[in-house]
């Protein structure tokens, strides 16, 4: 009985398991993949740029996407933390965070631009800016700037950081956050 309680406790309080319904995170995570998250983020472990986060749909993002699954959870890469200014000139230009252009080739789907459209967002306290790795097929923060939440995810809606793929068996392995991509980006203090 004790082993069952331990497993149940771990599942409820430490780890989450999620099925991936869309191609918004290709080629990092494919449709049908299943991932494990740690529920220890954002507390007590701090979120970092590059983390692959699972979060509650902040402003009904899935409503206009013709979603066929019945989950209100999304998975994207964390790009902007509170205080960050995230911008892009569009048309293949790199994403720029706090004045530093970042090279996302380590995780962007091959052949996909960082963003076709231009944008500039300063992330307020308590919010996050997220993007899919397959930007051509991702309704992420860029696509929801007029949703009432300005396309930003409340930190409290984050359910965990994905760190491992457990299905399909031929793709079992660790997921990389590619924190090194963001190493030169300075930290900014958020405003309310």
Question: How would you label these PLM feature ranges?
Answer:
Residues 13-19, 27-192:
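Soluble "head" domains of membrane/secretory-pathway proteins
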Residues 1-13:
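Hydrophobic membrane-insertion alpha-helices, especially the h-region
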């Amino acid at each position: 009985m004790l082993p069952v309680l331990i497993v149940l406790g771990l599942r409820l309080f430490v780890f989450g398991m999620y099925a991936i319904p869309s191609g918004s995170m290709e080629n990092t995570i494919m449709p049908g993949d299943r991932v494990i998250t740690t529920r220890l983020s954002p507390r007590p472990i701090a979120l970092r740029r590059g983390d692959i986060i699972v979060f509650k749909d902040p402003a009904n993002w899935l409503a206009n996407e013709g979603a066929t699954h019945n989950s209100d959870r999304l998975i994207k890469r964390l790009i902007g933390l509170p205080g960050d200014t995230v911008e892009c000139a569009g048309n293949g230009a790199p994403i720029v965070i706090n004045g530093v252009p970042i090279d996302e080739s380590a995780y962007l789907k091959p052949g996909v631009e960082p963003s076709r459209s231009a944008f500039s967002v300063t992330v307020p306290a308590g919010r996050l800016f997220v993007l899919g790795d397959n930007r051509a097929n991702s309704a992420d923060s860029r696509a929801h700037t007029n949703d009432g939440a300005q396309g930003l995810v409340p930190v409290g809606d984050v359910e965990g950081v994905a760190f491992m793929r457990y299905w399909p068996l031929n793709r079992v392995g660790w997921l990389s956050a590619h924190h090194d991509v963001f190493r030169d980006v300075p930290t900014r203090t958020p405003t309310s």
